[in-house]
């Protein structure tokens, strides 16, 4: 019965691949393969017996291993030493492209905690299972969104989410380019930052089951990547380059991150535009935005291009109402 055996293996692989981000994995599998729930649970029971998944509090999870490290945030601590001493051993045998992504992401995020958090402790948790590896980096400092709010004089900590989406925004221009979080968030399969009840999520359309209660923190960074990922750092860098490969001169800004329901004023527009003059190509993503005001549109699509003619600013995913206001602003002759 090779056909039946192959189908069973396919079903179990589906369960393993989707169990982390789906609480009701049985229903999802039943729907995907048009089989009964009892049939699905036979496959789940087999995976439990094989020690590939575990059941906890009524939910199923991939069997995983955790490794925890705690560091004093002092002048002798550095991200490269931590990587060499404790972290890199967890990635022996992974493809070169996966290795490169983890080197880049870990170094950037650990350094961020080291130099920006103003905390006393930095904690790292490496969690790995059959399919992917996760790293959690947490600190007990000021909190990333609060730090950004104070440095950029923002109205609310939630406004910091928009600044992170822009890129080239940093609280320490002398030492940092503002590219670390931006590119790290794009490179990984999943990237999230938790701080003071606020979440920055690089993949908000996906459902995540992440336990943030295991450790007290001011900021917690979560990175996840499949062990056999085909992603390459170069491809992500090139995606945000318009001319020379590797030049970070393009950005895509989701307008929904503006932390307001009514986008009507010039002040709101200026907050979105802050720092975007540093790019050659700016794309504003209007997904989820129902309407915008005349003054808001005019500031972005008429005033800003006159002030910064070397920066191209365009819109995507604009509905009919939004596009009407954009066209009206572009065609205004003064």
Q: How would you describe each model-predicted region?
A:
Residues 279-292:
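Short, glycine-/small-residue-enriched flexible loop/hinge segments at domain edges that mediate gating
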Residues 297-308:
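Short, non-transmembrane amphipathic alpha-helical segments
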Residues 54-69, 113-233, 304:
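Conserved beta-strand-loop-beta-strand hairpin that lines the nucleotide-binding pocket
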Residues 268, 296-297:
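Residues at alpha-helix caps and immediate loop-helix transition turns in enzyme cores, especially N-
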Residues 292-295, 324:
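Short active-site-adjacent structural elements
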Residues 1-107, 116-121, 230-273, 277-278, ...:
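Bergerat-fold GHKL ATPase/HATPase_c domain
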Residues 142, 289, 318-319:
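Short beta->alpha junction loops/turns
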Residues 183, 271, 299-300:
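A short acidic, amphipathic alpha-helical/loop segment
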């Amino acid at each position: 019965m090779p056909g039946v055996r192959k189908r069973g293996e396919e079903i179990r692989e589906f369960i393993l691949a989707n169990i982390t981000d789906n609480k009701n994995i049985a229903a999802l599998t039943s729907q995907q393969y048009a089989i009964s729930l009892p049939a699905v649970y036979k496959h789940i029971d087999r995976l439990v017996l094989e020690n590939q998944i575990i059941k906890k509090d009524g939910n199923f999870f991939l069997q995983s291993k955790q490794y925890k490290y705690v560091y004093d945030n002092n002048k002798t601590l550095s991200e490269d030493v931590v990587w060499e001493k404790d972290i890199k051993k967890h990635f022996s045998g992974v493809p070169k492209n996966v290795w490169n992504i983890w080197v880049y992401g870990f170094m950037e995020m650990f350094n961020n905690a080291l130099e920006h958090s103003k905390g006393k402790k930095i904690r790292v948790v490496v969690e790995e299972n059959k399919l992917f590896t996760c790293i959690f980096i947490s600190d007990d400092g000021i909190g990333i969104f609060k730090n950004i709010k104070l440095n950029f004089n923002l109205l609310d900590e939630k406004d910091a989410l928009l600044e992170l989406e822009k890129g080239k925004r940093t609280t320490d221009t002398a030492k940092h380019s503002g590219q670390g979080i931006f590119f790290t968030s794009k490179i990984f399969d999943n990237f999230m930052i938790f701080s003071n009840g606020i979440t920055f999520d690089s993949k908000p359309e996906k459902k995540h089951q992440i336990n943030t209660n295991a450790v007290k923190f001011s900021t917690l960074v979560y990175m996840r990547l499949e062990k056999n990922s085909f992603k390459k750092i170069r491809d992500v860098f090139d995606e945000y380059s318009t001319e020379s490969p590797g030049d970070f001169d393009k950005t895509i800004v989701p307008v929904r991150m503006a932390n307001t329901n009514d986008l009507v004023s010039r002040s709101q527009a200026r907050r979105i535009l802050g720092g975007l003059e540093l790019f050659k190509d700016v794309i504003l993503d209007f997904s989820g935005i129902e309407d915008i005001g005349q003054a808001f549109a005019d500031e972005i699509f008429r005033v800003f291009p006159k002030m910064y003619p070397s920066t191209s600013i365009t819109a995507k995913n604009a509905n009919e109402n939004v596009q009407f206001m954009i066209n009206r602003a572009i065609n205004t002759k003064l």
